[in-house]
């Protein structure tokens, strides 16, 4: 047949030969097996461009936008490009304009019929969202693992009484488990931020073309379903011009929150190393600590240092999308770089892995913590609280009395458990002299001494959210339930994506007779 337009059309309209079909089926089988087993780590730009092309072939064929006679050849070209890219060391193009030439080489110019109503803008916005989506699930997974270590450590130390600090100064006695649950609550909010960010990122831009849609009647919802997206980006301009720019910024905010929470915890532990007899340290060796090259007595907290450094790196990378998005016109690629944004999330994951090691390496000396509490006046507020709660002495009057006790004790090097009751009576009388309140200290000596017992103070707390045993049990159970819910959410979201891609593989395989 001569090479006329009509002859070319006839050639393009012929069904695939049986020999060609067999080759196509083997390639399709290999591609489907790889796609079904592809982990999130392997779902790069090339992978998603392949999935988008597969979905386009299926949908447009079903809906009459692609000549069914041409579909087998186009499907074969898609399958070949994907199979070639999956080979060891093979080139894996990451943009539409570098992916498409491989399709043309494999299937001829007919393969560009796939590009009906498509653009690099919506295709790249889609794969960027898909990759960020996978990254967020990886981050959520590690956050949950680290938070679980934190919560279980809290359960193990529910009744361990230690000093807590404000402004870097010993403030009040507390349960170490309660302190840890406070940090766990911060990470629980980070988990919530991940879910919220995920919902905004889990939206398909496909079918929005450049910025105002297309004249082709594309089935956007079906495309979203095949790619595992929960929703569509509603506004076509928003899809690639606005949303794809603010998504990395939002993920950066999540990574920043996690890194800041990690850094706060690490620094609180780090201050203990400044003391000569810390009540909390890292287990020596095992990469947790290292010796000084010059000073034999030193055991430097290397793991704390590296965790803090990694948290700082995560914050640094997380600021990148913010700075890159500042003062540029809508749609510019500056903050959209997949490699940079994945590196940002991976920095957050590494920080959490480091923190997990820190938590597992902590050694708490309960006796030393109690000694620390009893060597200072962290329980002094309880004197003012009891005077007001039981004897109607206004808090500020009681505070003046307690402050006077502390001043006298420090001037005379007296520890709380050794403070003379007679001096307490004298200081109280001076504090309330000339007022309408009881002129004699209404607390008996036994009550005065019990008020200075840090263990009794912790157990006697009565408000919700406190460190008392009943509340600790409730909050630990709640934290565990939250972790279980988050695990289920992660599993569900991954399952939705995997199931969607499996359906796409199955339907793509049907494109050949």
Region spans (language model):
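Leucine-rich amphipathic alpha-helices with coiled-coil/heptad-repeat character
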Residues: 85, 92, 150, 154-157, ...
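Glycine-rich cofactor/substrate-binding loops
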Residues: 20, 39-52, 106, 293-513
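Short, well-ordered beta-strand elements within core beta-sheets of diverse protein domains
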Residues: 57-65, 178, 249-257, 382-392
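Bacterial N-terminal signal peptides
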Residues: 25-33
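N-terminal secretory signal peptides that target proteins for export/translocation
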Residues: 1-19
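A helix-coil-helix interface module used to build multimeric assemblies
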Residues: 20, 34-203, 207-213, 218-224, ...
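Charged, flexible cofactor/metal-binding loops and thiol motifs
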Residues: 128-133, 137-144, 148, 155, ...
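Conserved hydrophobic residue
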Residues: 65-66, 278-280, 393, 415
């Amino acid at each position: 047949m001569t090479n006329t337009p009509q002859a070319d059309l006839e050639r393009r309209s012929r069904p695939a030969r049986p020999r060609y079909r067999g080759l196509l089926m083997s390639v399709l089988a290999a591609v489907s097996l790889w796609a079904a087993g592809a982990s999130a780590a392997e779902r790069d730009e090339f992978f998603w461009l392949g999935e988008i092309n597969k979905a386009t072939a299926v949908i447009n064929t079903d809906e009459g936008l692609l000549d069914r006679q041409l579909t087998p050849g186009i499907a074969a070209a898609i399958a070949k490009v994907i199979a070639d890219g999956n080979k060891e060391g093979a080139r894996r193009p990451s943009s539409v304009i570098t992916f498409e030439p491989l399709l043309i080489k494999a299937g001829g110019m007919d393969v560009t019929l796939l590009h009906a109503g498509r653009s690099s803008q919506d295709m790249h916005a889609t794969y960027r969202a898909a990759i960020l989506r996978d990254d967020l699930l990886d981050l959520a997974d590690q956050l949950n693992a680290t938070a679980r270590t934190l919560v279980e450590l809290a359960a193990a130390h529910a009744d361990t009484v230690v000093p807590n600090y404000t402004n870097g100064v010993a403030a009040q006695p507390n349960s170490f488990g309660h302190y840890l649950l406070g940090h766990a609550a911060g990470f629980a909010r980070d988990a919530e931020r991940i879910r919220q960010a995920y919902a905004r990122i889990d939206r398909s831009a496909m079918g929005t073309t450049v910025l105002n849609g297309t004249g082709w009647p594309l089935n956007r919802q079906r495309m979203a379903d095949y790619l595992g997206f929960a929703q569509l980006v509603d506004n076509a301009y928003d899809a690639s011009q606005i949303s794809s720019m603010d998504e990395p910024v939002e993920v950066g905010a999540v990574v920043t929150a996690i890194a800041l929470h990690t850094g706060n915890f690490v620094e609180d532990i780090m201050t203990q190393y400044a003391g000569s007899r810390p009540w909390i340290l890292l287990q020596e060796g095992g990469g947790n600590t290292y010796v000084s090259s010059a000073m034999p007595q030193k055991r430097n907290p290397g793991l704390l240092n590296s965790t803090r450094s990694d948290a700082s790196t995560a914050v640094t990378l997380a600021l990148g999308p913010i700075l890159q998005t500042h003062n540029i016109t809508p749609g510019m690629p500056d903050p959209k770089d997949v490699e940079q944004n994945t590196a940002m999330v991976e920095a957050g994951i590494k920080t959490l892995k480091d923190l997990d090691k820190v938590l597992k390496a902590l050694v708490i000396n309960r006796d030393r913590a109690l000694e620390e509490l009893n060597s200072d006046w962290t329980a002094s507020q309880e004197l003012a609280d009891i005077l007001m709660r039981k004897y109607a002495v206004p808090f500020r009057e009681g505070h003046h009395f307690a402050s006077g006790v502390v001043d006298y004790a420090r001037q005379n090097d007296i520890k709380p458990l050794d403070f003379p009751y007679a001096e307490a009576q004298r200081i109280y009388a001076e504090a309330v002299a000339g007022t309408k309140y009881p002129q004699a200290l209404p607390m008996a000596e036994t009550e005065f001494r019990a008020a200075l017992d840090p263990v009794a103070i912790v157990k006697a707390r009565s408000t919700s959210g406190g460190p008392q045993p009943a509340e600790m049990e409730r909050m630990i159970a709640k934290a565990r339930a939250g972790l279980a819910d988050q695990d289920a959410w992660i599993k569900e979201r991954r399952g939705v994506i995997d199931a969607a891609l499996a359906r796409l593989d199955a339907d793509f395989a049907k494109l050949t007779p």
